[in-house]
Amino acid sequence: MLISLALLAGCDDRAAMAARDDGDPMQYGGVSGLNYTPYYIHTFNVKGHDDNGISGGGPNIQPASPDNMPSGGGKETCCASFHKKWRPGLKVTVRWIANKKLDGIAWGAWYKAEAEVPEYGTATYGMWAIFLPGDRVKVMIKDGNANGHNRVWARPADDDPYVGTGTVDEELTRQDEERREKQRQMKIAREAELAREAELSKQHETTQ
């Protein structure tokens, strides 16, 4: 299931602000990711809890290198929304597709994890999701590491309190599998129809 994002104009990482009804201003930025796992990540999305306004979806990310260097970071998608001013308790749910079968055929399963966004400064440069072994993930707002929590290229510590541990999202995976099976059956039916049309056309030509 592809998660669609509203494409917002002017997706500068320093971002224009949008005022919320509660007076808590939001801003927009790009979404990027790093992958420390050996598995391909097809897509991911972030959604805030309790309608806190945080949202975003990121690009696909290749597996980490054999020497455990992360992949990703070279591209971003538009756009994430997050608070101009950080406050404690900004929690999000992250969902992503990871292909662990490594057979080049399987699509992979959806995973989900809950995490809290660490403190960030006022000069921000977009949202980042850092995927770690053990189905773990950290979501941060890049800010030049103003408060010591958001060094994008430093692997989070194993005991980092802002790292959430995920589980398979059984329902979303099932829905995705059903959708793909329906598409597969439609493709088979269409190919069979085209084959019948070709055979009828061939028979018609031989009778002329």
Region roles according to the model:
Residues 1-5:
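Sec-dependent N-terminal signal peptides
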Residues 27-29:
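Structural beta-strand segments of beta-rich domains
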Residues 41-42:
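Short acidic/proline- and small/hydrophobic-mixed sequence motifs that coincide with surface turns
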Residues 46-102:
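Tryptophan-paired
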